[in-house]
Amino acid sequence: MKVLRDGTTHEGTGAEIMEQLRQLTFDPDEYPDTETYIWQLRTNFIRSTGMDCTLPDGDTERMALAMIAQLGKIGALEVVEDA
């Protein structure tokens, strides 16, 4: 998978891309792992858009792909190449 965010291309699995984005946060230690970061993104997504953001049960990869899709819908990033 390949996504474009703020002029930077991120490549990898959905979970790997979310980990890359987590590392770019102001304080990556605030989110101890990728799954925690995804849940925080979800909370911010709902608060800022007023839209629902359902994430699937299961592993981090499925959650990451769903979150990337939601972020793509609002233009927060662009999916250049699907998984």
Language-model segment annotations:
Residues 1-35:
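N-terminal acidic leader/helix
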